[in-house]
Swiss-Prot record:
Binding site for ATP: P128, S129, G130, M131, G132, G133, A134, K149, Q233, R234, F235, V236, D298
UniProt entry tagged with the keyword Transcription: no
Residues covered by region (Activation loop): 296-322
Residues forming coiled coils: none
Biased composition (Polar residues): 467-484
Matching InterPro entries: P4KG1-8 (IPR044571), PI3/4_kinase_cat_dom (IPR000403)
Domain PI3K/PI4K catalytic: 121-416
GO CC aspect terms: cytosol
Catalytic class of the enzyme: transferase
Protein species of origin: Arabidopsis thaliana (Mouse-ear cress)
Gene behind the chain: PI4KG1
Protein name: Phosphatidylinositol 4-kinase gamma 1
Length: 561
């Protein structure tokens, strides 16, 4: 039986079992709060994976006289364990179950620490900032441990404690491409994809928390909501956020590492408020140039289900114009988008395949753009939609994906003998194949214009500038492991009319508002595995051609610092 996660039942008397259950790995995490040799508390353990399996084992024991016990609990009483499931269900003490990230030691340690604090009487404190329900969890001595965000208390959700919405889970949320209730799993995805803590995402878990006084709407009784699913992120001590200081205080390395993560995940909400500021040297003042490090938090609005308009606060910062260092280029070149996709499929089963495909596309885009010598600001600009003369136009990334997708369906039609003669049908395939909201899909003439939109000049980086990563092409041949769930195969995109014009200043953190009328963007959910592989090959070719053409600086931008 798998013993990665066990439940530690704390008892102070041989015949009494307390109401507390802690999910940890006693073999690797070295839980610091108890001494196994202590006579004050006796620890009993049992596997906490499947109570049905335990019940079946006990029935088998009584019927066949075949004693079945876990090797981790040789002294466990069969009589006591027979009622263990009922005892744990009947308890009113706080319990936490890890739903995602249980294989990561830092996640298990975080959950164990939070659980012990809560069973000792610590109460979650609702933070006044933000639009959603975020709770600060502390130890009995008042030390900050983590921040919990229940998914049903997200902005616009029906159980929001700040009365900012009444939407049910699964409806379009703050961004139409991310449904209500699905930000928590994206918080965990960002942590899992931040390999070796390169960007500094704090340890994050997806948990189920029961019998904890979170907010409950008047329309629901607590008895009907015994537990809540929430993201749990370790608290990071800080004095400011990036919005309280000028960008000149931050190191270029810190900005680059956050930007690399944002590009990979297509972060739709990287504003100054979710970048915490820490000093590199406590003796240095914050106002000195390049002395502060940034810690990224709040990744619930990343990995959208279709291409959307990202918001990168760092886009106009001077650090984003500095070329990538060799260390950063090596990190980017070693990224494997298909390995990342398989990781998310394995660890996060409920994350839609369409969101995983967005990760693959954005990672391929990042790798080729960095290899071509583009700086972070140039890459971010090519992923961001342009707003001029009262109209919003697609980004270069969206335009390339539109052309690649059109070529895929064009070839599919020819292979299926459904194609017709003449250029009229070809134009129809390119202009009417995709479902966009609030406007018509740009036709070939409009698409070609995007390749001539002025952009900052390329930054030469020696031999790297003329090489396109070969691992992307090689990985495409092995992309047969891409899977499409039954739900996604039957999903149908719904059109929403109208286009909402935005007049926000991109250098400031914009207020988030529901974007149900925005253009829906390019979606990859309607492609089969074969079509997806063909799309990636076409997309890589189009991207290589677009990057090789170069461009002139856009008005208001310069790569000189």
């Amino acid at each position: 039986m798998n013993c990665l996660a066990t439940t530690i039942i704390i008892t102070c008397k041989p015949t009494l079992i307390s109401d507390m259950a802690v999910a940890i790995d006693p073999f690797s995490d070295k839980f610091p709060y108890f001494n196994r040799s202590s006579q004050r508390c006796r620890l009993q353990s049992l596997t906490n994976l499947d109570f049905n399996f335990l019940a079946q084992s006990f029935n088998h024991t009584f019927e066949d006289d075949n004693i079945h016990r876990s090797v981790s609990s040789p002294c466990f009483s069969i009589a006591a364990s027979a009622n263990m499931e009922e005892d744990l269900k009947a308890t009113t003490a706080p319990r936490i179950e890890i739903l995602g990230g249980q294989r990561v030691p830092t996640v298990r340690a975080l959950v164990a620490e939070v659980t012990m604090a809560m069973v000792s009487g610590a109460q979650p404190l609702l933070l006044p900032s933000g639009m959603g329900g975020a709770y600060l969890l502390q130890t009995g001595k008042g030390h900050n441990i983590a921040v919990a965000k229940p998914v049903d208390e997200e902005p616009l959700a029906f159980n929001n404690p700040k009365k900012s919405g009444n939407l049910m889970l699964g409806q379009p949320g703050m961004k139409h491409s991310i449904p209500v209730g699905e930000t928590g799993i994206r918080e965990l995805a960002a942590y899992l994809l931040d390999y070796q803590g390169f960007s500094g995402v704090p340890p994050t878990a997806l948990v189920s928390i029961s019998h904890v006084p979170f907010h409950v709407s008047d329309a629901f009784s607590f008895s009907s909501m015994p537990y809540k699913v929430a993201s749990l992120q370790r608290f990071v001590g800080h004095d400011f956020d990036a919005g309280e200081l000028g960008p000149g205080s931050f190191t270029a390395t810190s900005v680059h590492r956050i930007g690399i993560l944002d590009v990979r995940l297509l972060n739709l909400d990287r504003h100054a408020g979710n970048m915490l500021v820490k000093r590199c040297d406590k003796k240095e003042a914050y106002n000195r140039l390049g002395t502060a490090e940034l810690v990224p938090i709040d990744h619930g609005l990343c990995l959208p289900e279709c291409l959307d308009d990202p918001y990168f606060e760092w886009l106009n910062w001077p650090q984003a114009l500095v070329p990538f260092s060799d260390t950063e280029l090596d990190y980017i070149s070693n990224l494997d988008p298909f390995k990342d996709a398989e990781l998310l499929r394995t660890e996060l089963h409920s994350l839609p395949e369409s969101a995983i495909r967005v990760l693959v596309v954005c990672t391929v885009f990042l790798k080729q753009a960095a290899a071509a010598g583009l700086c972070l600001a140039e890459i971010g600009e090519k992923m961001t939609r342009d707003f001029s003369k009262g109209e919003e136009s697609f980004s270069l990334l969206e335009t390339l994906c539109t052309k690649a997708k059109a070529s895929v369906f064009g070839k599919t039609s020819e292979d299926s003998d459904y194609s017709h003669e003449g250029n009229e049908v070809n134009t129809e395939l390119q202009c009417g194949m995709f479902k966009f909201d609030g406007g018509d899909t740009p036709c070939e003439a409009e698409i070609s214009e995007v390749f001539h939109v002025s952009k900052p000049p390329l930054v030469p980086r020696g031999p790297r500038a003329n090489t396109i990563p070969n691992d992307v092409t090689a990985s495409m041949s092995s992309s047969q492991n891409q899977r499409i769930t039954h739900q996604e195969k039957s999903a149908k995109e719904k059109k929403r009319g109208g286009k909402q014009e935005r007049c926000t200043v991109r250098s400031k953190s914009p207020p988030i508002s529901p974007n149900h009328d925005e253009s829906k963007g390019v979606s990859f959910v309607d492609m089969t595995t074969v079509e997806w592989d063909t799309f990636l090959q076409s997309f890589q070719t189009l991207l290589q051609d677009a990057l090789s053409k170069g461009s002139t600086p856009r008005l208001g931008c310069s790569c000189e610092i």
